[in-house]
UniProtKB/Swiss-Prot annotation:
<dbReference type="GO" id="GO:0005737">
    <property type="term" value="C:cytoplasm"/>
</dbReference>
<comment type="function">
    <text>Major role in the synthesis of nucleoside triphosphates other than ATP. The ATP gamma phosphate is transferred to the NDP beta phosphate via a ping-pong mechanism, using a phosphorylated active-site intermediate.</text>
</comment>
<feature type="binding site">
    <location>
        <position position="91"/>
    </location>
    <ligand>
        <name>ATP</name>
    </ligand>
</feature>
<feature type="binding site">
    <location>
        <position position="85"/>
    </location>
    <ligand>
        <name>ATP</name>
    </ligand>
</feature>
<dbReference type="GO" id="GO:0006183">
    <property type="term" value="P:GTP biosynthetic process"/>
</dbReference>
<dbReference type="InterPro" id="IPR036850">
    <property type="entry name" value="NDK-like_dom_sf"/>
</dbReference>
<keyword id="KW-0963">Cytoplasm</keyword>
<feature type="active site" description="Pros-phosphohistidine intermediate">
    <location>
        <position position="115"/>
    </location>
</feature>
<dbReference type="InterPro" id="IPR023005">
    <property type="entry name" value="Nucleoside_diP_kinase_AS"/>
</dbReference>
<keyword id="KW-0808">Transferase</keyword>
<dbReference type="InterPro" id="IPR034907">
    <property type="entry name" value="NDK-like_dom"/>
</dbReference>
<keyword id="KW-0597">Phosphoprotein</keyword>
<keyword id="KW-0546">Nucleotide metabolism</keyword>
<keyword id="KW-0460">Magnesium</keyword>
<dbReference type="GO" id="GO:0046872">
    <property type="term" value="F:metal ion binding"/>
</dbReference>
<dbReference type="GO" id="GO:0006228">
    <property type="term" value="P:UTP biosynthetic process"/>
</dbReference>
<feature type="binding site">
    <location>
        <position position="112"/>
    </location>
    <ligand>
        <name>ATP</name>
    </ligand>
</feature>
Amino acid sequence: MERTFLMVKPDGVQRGLIGEVITRFERRGFKMVASRFEKLPDARVMEHYAEHVQKPFFPGLKAYITSGPCFLMVWEGKDIVKISRDMIGATNPAGAAPGTIRGDYALEIGMNVIHGSDSVETANREIAIHFKPEELVSYTRIDEQYLYE
């Protein structure tokens, strides 16, 4: 099964949206295989956002993402990277469809509630940045027989 990395950002944590995010993914049929609640250390922020470090918006992004705790998760399921991106909505909440997480809960691109990996390759990289292999738990949901053909 495919895996993806999701992170409820500080604004989502402060607004009490962790449970809402988990509920949406569980009800869709995906399973969480790892999670952690923490304030991200600078070194890991630099590694996670390595492609943005030289961009002019990075100092603000770094200040925001380290301003409070985040809730980090690894989810598993068929086509989860694409489906999770659809569930999350457009990066800019102004263009996010109603019914998506950002469409329902975010107003500003700089505080858009949640991060989700944009490809399988990115997911694998981000999972490795934030979790050790032994922190990922494999199990079978009791309802998997009703989720997949």
